[in-house]
């Protein structure tokens, strides 16, 4: 079938298998060009492994180090004439490329928050890997069914204590708009922490440790975004910020647990990129469009694979890791360059409907958004029929 992009709001409801595969190959090629990652991990578990930063981590570990990988994700398979999700096709392509290079790859498809998927993952580690020496936690989800209480928690994107008015882009109409966000209630804050805080990461590490599948010296990291002044009302001072502070508290206990066996636990702070999650946040399309404009002009623009490849080389397995005062690994240094942030702030209130395409890189933002779903990738013939029914070999469900 011939598949074209169909966008509704912040979701593209179609995906292109060949485009997703080409995107995965591009990321592999980037890692290969940079050469081997020295002293890297050998057996890696990535929780949230099918898109964005999690996929990039799996690619960097496999093709930069030669690591065996186990990826956990929650994706929809293709059915009849309906394509699967982008993460499904990304993972299928990863398996194909890993097999071609003789790399061990296992995947588990299901709800990472559930005890069932944790148990299935542990069984797969025992069978295929024995133990893992790196656990990457890269889960982005709007809700979580708590495995112990059965309560479903819904995350909320709201400020705390007062309403906040945010500038942004109505991406459907390509117009500047303002959104008034009302303050979160205490229950909404608690629910957001339950979904996006550190509890599930801790549950994963506790389960892996109790099962004996964490190697001596194992490391774990959870990916997060903090941002700067422009985004702080939402990302640090809002309901999501409380979840991020919970992540910072959680990592201290995990660090103590792993340090007893020569290991380590860190929160890794990554730069703002286009993801399905970020595109749904009212201010982020405008912020990203301005950030792309400024960083591309300076030659410092990076995407997921550049960020995570650098994180592994420079910080997780580098001799001189970039660590902030709170002990987080920082890969977002170029975004937070004072000159970059000053220029973004300077342009923030100047953007109008008329100059949207000149003051910002909204065109680049839109292109990156479509790439998430396999569209706009160089070398792919989007007028040619493509087979949507792609399988993932040896998938555990």
Swiss-Prot record:
Binding site for substrate: 225
Site annotation Plays an important role in discriminating NADH against NADPH: residues: 75
Quaternary data: Monomer.
NCBIfam families linked to this entry: EnoyACPredFabV, PRK13656.1
One BP annotation, GO: fatty acid biosynthetic process
Catalyzed chemical reaction(s): a 2,3-saturated acyl-[ACP] + NAD(+) = a (2E)-enoyl-[ACP] + NADH + H(+)
InterPro entries: Eno_Rdtase_FAD-bd_dom, Enoyl-CoA_Rdtase_cat_dom, FabV-like_NADH_b, Trans-2-enoyl-CoA_reductase
Family, as annotated: Belongs to the TER reductase family.
Entry keyword annotation includes Transferase: no
Pathway(s) it belongs to: Lipid metabolism; fatty acid biosynthesis
Gene Ontology terms, MF aspect: enoyl-[acyl-carrier-protein] reductase (NADH) activity; NAD binding; trans-2-enoyl-CoA reductase (NADH) activity
Protein name: Enoyl-[acyl-carrier-protein] reductase [NADH]
Domain of life: Bacteria
Enzyme Commission numbers on file: 1.3.1.9
